[in-house]
Amino acid sequence: MAVRAQFENSNEVGVFARLTNSYAVVAIGASENFYSVFEAELQDVIPICHATIAGTRIVGRLTAGNRKGLLVPTTTTDQELQHLRNTLPDSVKIQRIEERLSALGNVICCNDHVALIHPDLERETEEIIADVLGVEVFRQTIADNVLTGSYMALSNQGGIVHPKTSIRDQDELSSLLQVPLVAGSVNRGSAVVGAGMVVNDWLAVTGLDTTATELSVIESVFRLGEMGPRGVGMGSTNKESIVESFY
């Protein structure tokens, strides 16, 4: 399912939230409707942690994570770290990273199996990403942009990349990630798809400005109509039911 939301007049949902298959981290703020969207879809399924990171609300840009782990910058306070540890499932590893490129959400794009990272991240950071998130790590650019986390949104089902990504690059990335990719936009033409939305295997949340066409592309490439949270990892439904859902 794909839904639209706004965080205090901002459509950049991926700036203020981080969504995975085992938890969600959402910024603390005055946006009740923003929380209610997440709570309506996730409440009984995965924990939603209301948090700040390094005293700021841009939790989606400062963190990177998947079902197995969460990476936070070294500027994260001890209290914030403890709050995350108390709220997130015990199976999720939480690790502070000392890294010059500290907006981890901008420089790391990952699902539960693979991470695409900024070419200039330190070697030690690359090892921590592989260890904590349990993924294969590749240094990559998206349409010649080094900010992989900003210009790509990825789940275990599919991904959306910067609208100017060439067909050749899309094919290359798709075979690397082993998921279908599409070049697209969110929030009425924004190329910053990673910061404009959050997605896991059964839910996408995008900005209120996202058009119906953009939303249908998102639902299609991430295969969001196919299974609810209970069905994650159980394989997808057969093709007939997908075809029927278009009528």
UniProtKB/Swiss-Prot annotation:
Location, primary (coarse class): cytoplasm
NCBIfam families: eIF-6
Source organism phylogeny: Eukaryota, Fungi, Dikarya, Ascomycota, Pezizomycotina
Modified residues (Phosphoserine): 174-175
Single Gene Ontology BP annotation: ribosomal subunit export from nucleus
Subunit structure: Monomer. Associates with the 60S ribosomal subunit.
Protein name in the entry: Eukaryotic translation initiation factor 6
Listed GO MF terms: ribosomal large subunit binding; translation initiation factor activity
Compartments where located: Cytoplasm; Nucleus, Nucleolus
Organism: Aspergillus oryzae (strain ATCC 42149 / RIB 40) (Yellow koji mold)
Function: Binds to the 60S ribosomal subunit and prevents its association with the 40S ribosomal subunit to form the 80S initiation complex in the cytoplasm. Is also involved in ribosome biogenesis. Associates with pre-60S subunits in the nucleus and is involved in its nuclear export.
